[in-house]
Amino acid sequence: MAFRGRRPELRGPPELYYDKNEARKYVRNSRMIDVQIKMTGRALELLCVPEDKPCYVLDIGCGTGLSGDYLSDEGHYWVGIDISPAMLDEALDRETQGDVILGDMGQGIPFKPGTFDACISISAVQWLCNANKKSDIPAKRLYCFFSSLYSVLVRGGRAVLQLYPENSEQLELITTQATRAGFTGGVVVDYPNSAKAKKFYLCLFSGPSTSLPEGLSEDTEEEKPAESTFTADRIPYRIARRGVVRKSREWVLEKKARRRRQGKEVCPDTQYTGRKRKPRF
């Protein structure tokens, strides 16, 4: 029973830990899907990419493609990289709209310089802090990852990496290697006083240093506990993405709220918000 509480990174290499059974959970467990989608939405919000212009986004540790589906839903194009063949097989079975490749981020990002406008990563970077074989040196693998990421981003591009650091020393190791690679930025912490809802987002800028976004707190948004449910079938990716119908009133209100948090000017909500226009003569 004590084994259940161990961090996934301590149970073995990611390509072995994320086998077919583990990959299946990511498309059948409603709790895992909901958490993944919320963190992706928050990462995209922290990126501050233009909402009226599609961007080319790199998804590090893309897994089954849930984060990529969210990006597609927001009108962006994406490419994902993951070290687990089983996770990528699930992504292909779900017919994700982005391209996925098998690769180890600790060995660098295999793309030409200036390929991507932005990058996101959900729950992946902390895996680089563990040495699964004698040749693995966490500091070197982190630097290789960040230096190649810096290269593949356009000038002024941003990366938001959600991660679960084991302790403050591990977080310092990650941020130090990112700084060595040329990035500016810092860590944004959402719900810092909550044991369960607390989330770390490493916000990196490949251009001039800018002010970091503010982290969410219990005063800005109330976190509600969610329950896990399992189904025998895969959840269709359009339902798994958000549970909100695109262009619906709820979808419009959520998008306007996100723009307000980014400090953008947004029209006030009215009874006509999200209502479809009648056809003209």
UniProtKB/Swiss-Prot annotation:
<keyword id="KW-0805">Transcription regulation</keyword>
<dbReference type="Pfam" id="PF12589">
    <property type="entry name" value="WBS_methylT"/>
</dbReference>
<dbReference type="GO" id="GO:0006325">
    <property type="term" value="P:chromatin organization"/>
</dbReference>
<keyword id="KW-0963">Cytoplasm</keyword>
<keyword id="KW-0804">Transcription</keyword>
<feature type="region of interest" description="Disordered">
    <location>
        <begin position="256"/>
        <end position="281"/>
    </location>
</feature>
<keyword id="KW-0690">Ribosome biogenesis</keyword>
<dbReference type="InterPro" id="IPR029063">
    <property type="entry name" value="SAM-dependent_MTases_sf"/>
</dbReference>
<comment type="subunit">
    <text>Heterodimer with TRMT112; this heterodimerization is necessary for the metabolic stability and activity of the catalytic subunit BUD23. Interacts with GRIP1.</text>
</comment>
<keyword id="KW-0698">rRNA processing</keyword>
<dbReference type="GO" id="GO:2000234">
    <property type="term" value="P:positive regulation of rRNA processing"/>
</dbReference>
<comment type="function">
    <text>S-adenosyl-L-methionine-dependent methyltransferase that specifically methylates the N(7) position of a guanine in 18S rRNA. Requires the methyltransferase adapter protein TRM112 for full rRNA methyltransferase activity. Involved in the pre-rRNA processing steps leading to small-subunit rRNA production independently of its RNA-modifying catalytic activity. Important for biogenesis end export of the 40S ribosomal subunit independent on its methyltransferase activity. Locus-specific steroid receptor coactivator.</text>
</comment>
<dbReference type="GO" id="GO:0005654">
    <property type="term" value="C:nucleoplasm"/>
</dbReference>
<dbReference type="GO" id="GO:0048471">
    <property type="term" value="C:perinuclear region of cytoplasm"/>
</dbReference>
<keyword id="KW-0156">Chromatin regulator</keyword>
<dbReference type="GO" id="GO:0005730">
    <property type="term" value="C:nucleolus"/>
</dbReference>
<dbReference type="GO" id="GO:0046982">
    <property type="term" value="F:protein heterodimerization activity"/>
</dbReference>
<comment type="similarity">
    <text>Belongs to the class I-like SAM-binding methyltransferase superfamily. BUD23/WBSCR22 family.</text>
</comment>
<keyword id="KW-0808">Transferase</keyword>
<keyword id="KW-0832">Ubl conjugation</keyword>
<keyword id="KW-0489">Methyltransferase</keyword>
<keyword id="KW-0539">Nucleus</keyword>
<dbReference type="InterPro" id="IPR013216">
    <property type="entry name" value="Methyltransf_11"/>
</dbReference>
<dbReference type="GO" id="GO:0070476">
    <property type="term" value="P:rRNA (guanine-N7)-methylation"/>
</dbReference>
<dbReference type="GO" id="GO:0016435">
    <property type="term" value="F:rRNA (guanine) methyltransferase activity"/>
</dbReference>
<dbReference type="InterPro" id="IPR039769">
    <property type="entry name" value="Bud23-like"/>
</dbReference>
<dbReference type="InterPro" id="IPR022238">
    <property type="entry name" value="Bud23_C"/>
</dbReference>
<keyword id="KW-0949">S-adenosyl-L-methionine</keyword>
<dbReference type="Pfam" id="PF08241">
    <property type="entry name" value="Methyltransf_11"/>
</dbReference>
<protein>
    <recommendedName>
        <fullName>18S rRNA (guanine-N(7))-methyltransferase</fullName>
        <ecNumber>2.1.1.-</ecNumber>
    </recommendedName>
</protein>
